[in-house]
UniProtKB/Swiss-Prot annotation:
SMART domains, sorted: RRM
Compositionally biased residues, Basic residues: 21-44
Skewed-composition ranges (Acidic residues): 263-274
Lineage: Eukaryota, Fungi, Dikarya, Ascomycota, Taphrinomycotina
GO terms of molecular function: mRNA binding
Any single GO CC term annotated in Swiss-Prot or TrEMBL for this entry: nucleus
UniProt keywords, alphabetically: RNA-binding
Protein name: Uncharacterized RNA-binding protein C106.12c
Residue stretches making up the RRM domain: 85-161
Length: 274
């Protein structure tokens, strides 16, 4: 440091150096803070994307399809089998509930009771009771016929098994309706069979219409032979006709008119008549 510098110059140099270092530090800090903010935004966006409840559109569609066409559960299959052996109970008091009917038939192993109500929710005075076997249903009918239940004598009749239409209507929608894959496979099989049939028919037609080289050579030879025979016949006829004309001229005899000349004369006469 020079001794000739004044105190003010020394202070200004130190101040400028401090400001320069401080500005560089602040610039690097700003760059670091910008980078950290970008990194934080990227991590946050990726986290929100990965933690979204819907991983893809197919998952949502699959849930909707399952809701629209529920699978046949074990309970539903059991219920369909349970509807085979049942009795109809009529003349029930309007206060009779499902638990009352179950307690009445408990000795005959009932597995299901269906109370019949109208649209207003009022009892129709009847219910259907289903059993494990047909023997249990018959025993319950014989034993509990005309039993008094809450002041009313019940009437029990054997319930006929459901018809085919009822079984199909009670069947879940997913069991009745074929899946998309099966329909698409059937459509693919039909189209492939049609294509196969069309290909085979076209191949048969092409095989029937195809002509080999030997057949072509044979046809050409036949045509050449027929043409040669025709030319030979015409040459012989002209040779036979020429000497006869020459002999007639030598003998000063009239030449017999040919068929062509006669035909020409007839045509001329017809034209003159017209």
């Amino acid at each position: 440091m020079s001794l000739e510098k004044s105190l003010d110059e020394i202070i200004n140099e130190r101040t400028n150096g401090f400001d320069h270092k401080h500005s560089r530090r602040r610039g690097s800090q700003n760059r670091i803070s910008k980078k950290s903010r970008l990194t934080y935004k990227f991590k946050r966006a990726s986290k929100e994307h990965n933690s979204s409840p819907d991983d893809g559109p197919w998952q949502h569609d699959l849930d909707q399809e399952q809701d629209a066409h529920p699978r046949t559960t074990h309970l539903q299959k059991r219920q369909h089998s349970e509807n085979r052996f049942g009795v109809r109970v009529e003349n029930l008091h309007y206060q009779v509930l499902e638990k009352d009917v179950l307690s009445l038939f408990e000795n005959f192993h009932p597995i299901r009771v269906i109370m019949n109500y109208d649209r207003a929710g009022r009892s129709e005075g009847s219910c259907d009771v289903y059993f494990e076997t047909s023997q249990d249903a018959e025993d319950a009918q014989k034993t509990l016929q005309s039993t008094n239940l809450k002041g009313s004598e019940i009437q029990i009749s054997k319930k006929s098994p459901p018809s085919l239409f009822d079984r199909i209507s009670d069947m879940p929608h997913s069991a009745r309706k074929p899946s998309r894959s099966s329909r698409s496979n059937r459509g693919f099989n039909r189209s492939s069979k049609k294509d196969d049939r069309s290909f085979r028919s076209s191949s048969k037609k092409s095989s029937n219409n195809s002509i080999s080289h030997e057949d072509l050579d044979k046809e050409l030879d036949e045509y050449a032979m027929s043409f040669h025979a025709a030319s030979t016949v015409s040459s012989h006829s002209s040779q036979d006709f020429t000497p006869s004309i020459a002999n007639a001229h030598e003998k000063n005899e009239p030449v017999a008119p040919s068929k062509d000349s006669n035909l020409t004369e007839e045509m001329d006469l017809q034209m003159e008549a017209v």
